[in-house]
């Protein structure tokens, strides 16, 4: 699986979608491989179409031997406000994914939305205002197997959010959700010029991934040196 690695630290991004987290990790110096149950033709790095839990199971030995970091973004619909409104049935994957990652022993990050806070262990919150991008986009990140993330200072939200479904005016922050207008601007904000509208809606902004990757890289070097 990792023939192209050639000594570079490897990260595997589960539930990768179109690769926002992956691109951030790549910018931090990892060689990244994406895994998603749905084919992702826009994903910009080596890609494996597979169920995440099955992938962990049948690639466990190879992952332990070669992988330095695993990130996972289980579907968030179960925890979203939309789910509470329409009562659709979605799988609860945070617990099973955590158990599988803990069994591997590889440093990991699990990402999800704010409404999943009670399901995550001591998560760090990231916001676009921390990175100077024009979307607030709060996301939570749990870490484990020796990896930790520091909680950045959370700046006040001074810019106004554009109303849902309306194009953001100059100085307004974007809601990158649903059938939003302004795909090109959203691509710029998220750092994903290759992404589709749906991919942007589901993505972790690239600056978040790079920040996580930089912290992980320094810690992983320390772990592997022991």
Language-model regions: role of each:
Residues 6, 27-29, 42-44, 64-65, ...:
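Short, well-ordered coil/turn elements that cap or connect secondary structure elements
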Residues 51-69, 76-224:
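Class I S-adenosyl-L-methionine
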């Amino acid at each position: 699986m990792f023939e192209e690695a050639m000594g570079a630290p490897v990260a595997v991004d589960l539930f990768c979608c179109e690769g926002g987290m992956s691109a951030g990790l790549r910018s931090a110096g990892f060689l990244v491989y994406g895994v998603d149950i749905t084919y992702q033709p826009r994903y910009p790095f080596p890609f494996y179409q597979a169920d995440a839990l099955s992938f962990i199971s049948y690639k466990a030995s190879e992952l332990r031997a070669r992988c330095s970091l695993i990130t996972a973004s289980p579907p968030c619909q179960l925890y979203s406000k939309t789910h509470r409104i329409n009562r659709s049935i979605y799988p609860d994957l945070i617990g099973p994914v955590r158990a599988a990652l803990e069994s591997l022993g590889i440093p990991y990050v699990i990402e999800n939305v704010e409404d999943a806070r009670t399901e995550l262990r001591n998560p760090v919150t990231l916001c676009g205002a921390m990175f100077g991008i024009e979307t607030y986009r709060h996301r939570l990140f749990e870490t484990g197997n020796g990896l930790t993330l520091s909680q950045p200072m959370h700046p006040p939200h001074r810019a106004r959010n554009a109303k849902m479904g309306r194009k953001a005016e100059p100085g307004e922050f974007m809601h990158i959700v649903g059938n939003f207008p302004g795909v090109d601007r959203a691509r710029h904000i998220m750092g994903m010029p290759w992404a589709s509208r749906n991919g942007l809606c589901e993505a972790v902004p690239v600056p978040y991934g790079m920040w996580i990757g930089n912290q992980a890289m320094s810690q992983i070097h320390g772990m592997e040196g022991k």
